[in-house]
Amino acid sequence: MRNLSGGHVEEFVLVGFPTTPPLQLLLFVLFFAIYLLTLLENALIVFTIWLAPSLHRPMYFFLGHLSFLELWYINVTIPRLLAAFLTQDGRVSYVGCMTQLYFFIALACTECVLLAVMAYDRYLAICGPLLYPSLMPSSLATRLAAASWGSGFFSSMMKLLFISQLSYCGPNIINHFFCDISPLLNLTCSDKEQAELVDFLLALVMILLPLLAVVSSYTAIIAAILRIPTSRGRHKAFSTCAAHLAVVVIYYSSTLFTYARPRAMYTFNHNKIISVLYTIIVPFFNPAIYCLRNKEVKEAFRKTVMGRCHYPRDVQD
């Protein structure tokens, strides 16, 4: 189980979801189906937005970035989990664990900031539709998207610098289905106070501040919706915003509960279950909430992606 060299753990063992073999098989089928559907949904959205000129606007530009992010996000955790279900082997090397941790934190932080940017974009579009083209030009949208990715990967690098300097002398059992920061901090034999403080502060900055921006934007959006004169218009706008807000609340609340509260490392079983929400469930529902219910996206998908699929047959006929 452990391979120690000079007092340093060279591999970790991920506990995952220890259950009976029949339930393991059921979980494998469930997560594998979610994984494939998530890949398909997000890939179709990325290609649709890329191929359709009618969607080359800031709103869909951000949606494309979100779907592209989800493609990487779900690949950080689920493939290793699926392999563990099949092989019953949860071992992961030290380097592999740190690599998974880095990309997971980077993509999670990027999503937090990107969701805030998307909420701000919707605020500008709904509360100032006449000024929206000048307030959100494509150049600003590009800079905001780049800032989202840059801040996410930079904050992850800062966390990893502190985590990688800690010593791991054993045990090497991680009570999680992927390499997360809290169980790793619990395994270290070094003084972890500074690393815990950095982790907590960065979690507050990268999760709480974007959440406040989202809440502020949607508060203004709801106030604008209430001023819509027709009940049909209000109902349509509310149904769209409620779906978006539900995803945002689930994602931010679960990440805040896991990372931005003191002594989070002592509730591994709860954290492991909650982690399923923002690592598997939210990426699965995001495309349906943000894009697949959107008439413009569906129409663009029909004309571009489906049209290209049928084009060779039309030529042959």
Curated annotation (Swiss-Prot):
Belongs to the G-protein coupled receptor 1 family. It is a multi-pass membrane protein. Residues 47-54, 121-139, 218-237, 293-317 are cytoplasmic. This is Olfactory receptor 6P1. GO terms for molecular function: G protein-coupled receptor activity; olfactory receptor activity. Keywords: Cell membrane, Disulfide bond, G-protein coupled receptor, Glycoprotein, Membrane, Olfaction, Receptor, Sensory transduction, Transducer, Transmembrane, Transmembrane helix. GO terms for cellular component: plasma membrane. Residues 1-25, 76-99, 161-197, 259-271 are extracellular. Gene3D superfamilies: Rhodopsin 7-helix transmembrane proteins. Glycans are attached at N3, N186. The chain crosses the membrane at residues 26-46, 55-75, 100-120, 140-160, 198-217, 238-258, 272-292. CDD domains: 7tmA_OR6B-like (cd15224). Its main location: membrane. Disulfide bonds join C97-C189. One of its GO terms (biological process) is detection of chemical stimulus involved in sensory perception of smell. It comes from Homo sapiens. Odorant receptor. It is found in: Cell membrane.
